[in-house]
Amino acid sequence: MDKILLVNVFGEDKPGVTNAVAESLTSFGIAVLDIGQSVIHDQLNLGILVCVPAGKLFSDIQNALTKTLNEISMQVRCIPVSRNSYDNWVANQGKSRHIITLLARRIEARDLAAVTDVTLKYGLNIDKIIRLSGRVNFSKRNDL
């Protein structure tokens, strides 16, 4: 039976990381179920949810990825995902969503804590956080 694996790659962002992962996975006949990435201050966090064909071992995949990514100074973590967990995740994609937009010239940790306290109070999970503004100039941060 096919299995599901979440591959999390992280480290200093550089060209070719996604290619290195994809090339490494190619020999296992893996299908990509989902993919996403974020880069904050040149630090990459890449997640790829994959379908592993029956007969392929998670340990072989992790070893291949670790070898490939060590060559480009990246790290990898592989997490098995149960079929039940995956099915629940897929079933939730059509559920209603709430969007919160936080508008401020300057955001303090207390602002983020106040907003997330409300989400916690109502049992809501944060699916995605996106910065809509430009990056803050560190030397001018107190002017905001």
Regions found by a protein language model. Name each.
Residues 1-144:
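A conserved regulatory-domain signal marking ACT and ACT-like small-molecule sensing domains
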